[in-house]
């Protein structure tokens, strides 16, 4: 499957040129934003860890081995890409135990930058955002055009697609999800099951978002839409008054799309008709997600880009810095500016 099939059309026009992302790990830096004050005491040891070319799950295994605890005793908020320089939190459950010597886990690919005790473990999804520093190299695009496009994105946001990382190489995770759905079965391995359910659900969401990008309604509220604030998981229906809410114009409030699961969509009007039409294309997949116990949830269609700045360290290098809500993909910002030329394997099954 192509990127266009997995995601959908761009909202800002054709790409302005080409560039390479992730030529080296330092070209893709991610800093987890966690708004939790740590108490300094408790049976959980929280670790601020820097990883280079190392995925989150392998880092967790190494930390657990060094601490002498089972891997189930370590927690993290979210998965980070392997081919990157990332900094994120982990927590170790150490009831009645002293702080372990973690030096055996450290090498050029992993460093423990900080250790703090706390009463609770780190929950999955606890981080509020991720900060990104991206260096696009071998840039072949007009700087003035790039500047204008980035200013446009700063003001209007981008479609909140799930990135290709979610779907595996060539959309393999989607193919596998469709195959399991057709057989009305689930993989026995928990991590495989989770990965394929996530891929199938994300694919359906992207199909819905692609249709709204195509008709120009992705950033505009319609009567019957369900609206949500950027950092909220709650939503409310849009009538005519809500469609004129000034918070839509300043990118605080957004229309949402369905994350398919058990239960009917609460949307109404034209948005509900479109959601039903998208679901009708893949009835087996929708039923599979519901039978797997996935709840119907919502995801904002428009992704606001926080604190977007950029400069050119060299004529053929563009450096971008910005913040995105947790669960959103930096690559969907980049694709609205340039086409990415591969400098090796840049996709991974991880989500930021």
UniProtKB/Swiss-Prot annotation:
Keyword Disulfide bond among record annotations: no
Catalytically driven reaction(s): uridine(13) in tRNA = pseudouridine(13) in tRNA
GO cellular component: cytosol
Domain of life: Bacteria
EC number: 5.4.99.27
InterPro entries the record matches: PsdUridine_synth_cat_dom_sf (IPR020103), PsdUridine_synth_TruD (IPR001656), PsdUridine_synth_TruD_CS (IPR020119), PsdUridine_synth_TruD_insert (IPR011760), TruD_catalytic (IPR042214), TruD_insert_sf (IPR043165), TruD_pseudoU_synthase (IPR050170)
GO BP, sorted A to Z: tRNA pseudouridine synthesis
Recorded family membership: Belongs to the pseudouridine synthase TruD family.
NCBIfam families registered for this protein in UniProt: PRK00984.1-2
The protein, known as: tRNA pseudouridine synthase D
Origin species: Pseudomonas putida (strain ATCC 47054 / DSM 6125 / CFBP 8728 / NCIMB 11950 / KT2440)
Lineage, broadest ranks: Bacteria, Pseudomonadati, Pseudomonadota, Gammaproteobacteria, Pseudomonadales
Gene: truD
């Amino acid at each position: 499957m192509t990127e266009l099939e997995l995601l959908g059309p761009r909202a800002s026009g054709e790409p302005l040129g080409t560039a390479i992302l992730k030529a080296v790990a330092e070209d893709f830096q991610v800093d987890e934003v966690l708004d939790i004050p740590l108490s300094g005491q408790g049976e959980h040891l929280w670790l601020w860890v820097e990883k280079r070319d190392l995925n989150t799950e392998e880092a967790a295994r190494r930390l657990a081995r060094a601490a002498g605890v089972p891997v189930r005793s370590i927690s993290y908020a979210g998965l980070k890409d392997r081919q990157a320089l990332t900094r994120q939190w982990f927590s170790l459950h150490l009831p009645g135990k002293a702080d372990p010597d973690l030096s055996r886990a450290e090498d050029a690919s992993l460093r423990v930058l900080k250790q703090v005790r706390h009463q609770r473990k780190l929950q999955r999804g606890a981080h509020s955002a991720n900060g990104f520093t991206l260096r696009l190299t071998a840039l072949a695009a007009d700087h003035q055009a790039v500047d204008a496009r980035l200013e446009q994105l700063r003001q209007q946001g981008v479609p909140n697609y799930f990135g290709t990382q979610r779907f595996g190489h060539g959309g393999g995770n989607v193919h596998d999800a469709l195959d399991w759905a057709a057989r009305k079965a689930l993989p026995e391995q928990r991590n495989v099951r989770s990965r394929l359910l996530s891929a199938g659900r994300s694919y359906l969401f992207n199909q819905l978002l692609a249709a709204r990008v195509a008709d120009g309604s992705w950033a505009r509220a319609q009567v019957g839409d369900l609206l949500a604030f950027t950092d909220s998981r709650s939503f409310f229906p849009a009538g005519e008054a809500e469609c004129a809410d000034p918070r839509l114009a300043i990118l605080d409030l957004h229309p949402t799309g369905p994350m398919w699961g058990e239960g009917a969509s609460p949307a109404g009007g034209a948005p509900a008709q479109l959601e039903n039409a998208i679901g009708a294309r893949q009835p087996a997949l929708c039923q599979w997600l519901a039978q797997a116990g996935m709840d119907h949830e919502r995801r904002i269609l428009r992704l606001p880009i926080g604190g977007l700045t950029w400069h050119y360290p060299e004529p053929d290098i563009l450096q971008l810095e910005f913040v995105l809500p947790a669960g959103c993909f930096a690559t969907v910002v980049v694709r609205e500016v340039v086409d990415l030329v591969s400098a090796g394997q840049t996709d991974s099954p991880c989500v930021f």
